């Protein structure tokens, strides 16, 4: 087995500088009101790296680099949330999601209705198995950042679904038209809990 020698120019293509990143735009799904998107997502999400995929997804489209393909594919991003904020409960069915707390404190909630939780402090890490309904929420008193790592087969990165009651929450808070726009835009509701 031999080593690989790469020069500084090639190594620079493998560096992502935070100061050069812009947050990934909030998903725009057929004129879904921005407050619905805010309910479903972190305040800001910075995509550092995503796998090269045949079907371009929002993960790859806005990533600073494509890579991490040493076997299973990997996506690396940072979710930034103000106190009390985080995405809606959801499940990844074919990919594994891991969280590393960078700043503030984050509750990792899981279970069919998010009935279980634990708190990550800075430098704490958790790995959530596929199929588990989960979310994260900043429970600190200041804006926080969470490193989010998703790993799986490159064509399985659009595997997110939301429990049916999240659809009910959207309908109650934002109306049936908002939910219709979410589902027609590709969001899946009605996860099966076994």
Description of each model-found segment:
Residues 1-73, 176-194:
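A short, N-terminal "cap"/entry segment at the start of jelly-roll beta-barrel domains
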Residues 79, 99, 126:
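Conserved GNAT-family N-acetyltransferase fold
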Residues 86-89, 93-122, 132:
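A short beta-strand-loop-beta hairpin characteristic of the jelly-roll/cupin
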């Amino acid at each position: 087995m031999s080593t690989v020698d790469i020069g500084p120019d090639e190594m620079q293509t493998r560096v992502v500088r935070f100061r050069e990143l812009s947050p990934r735009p909030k998903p725009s799904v057929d004129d879904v009101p921005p407050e619905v998107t805010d309910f479903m997502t972190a305040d800001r999400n910075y995509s550092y790296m995503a796998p090269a995929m045949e079907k371009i997804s929002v993960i790859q489209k806005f990533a600073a680099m494509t890579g991490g393909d040493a076997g299973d594919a990997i996506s690396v991003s940072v979710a930034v949330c103000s106190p009390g904020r985080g995405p809606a409960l959801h499940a990844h069915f074919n990919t594994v999601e891991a969280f590393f707390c960078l700043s503030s404190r984050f509750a990792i909630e899981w279970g069919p209705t998010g009935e279980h939780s634990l708190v990550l402090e800075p430098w704490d890490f958790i790995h959530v198995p596929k199929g588990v309904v989960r979310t994260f929420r900043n429970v600190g008193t200041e804006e926080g950042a969470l490193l989010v790592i998703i790993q799986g087969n490159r064509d399985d990165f659009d595997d997110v679904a939301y429990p049916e009651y999240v659809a009910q929450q959207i309908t109650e808070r934002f109306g049936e038209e908002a939910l219709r726009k979410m589902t027609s835009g590709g969001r899946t509701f009605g996860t099966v809990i076994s």
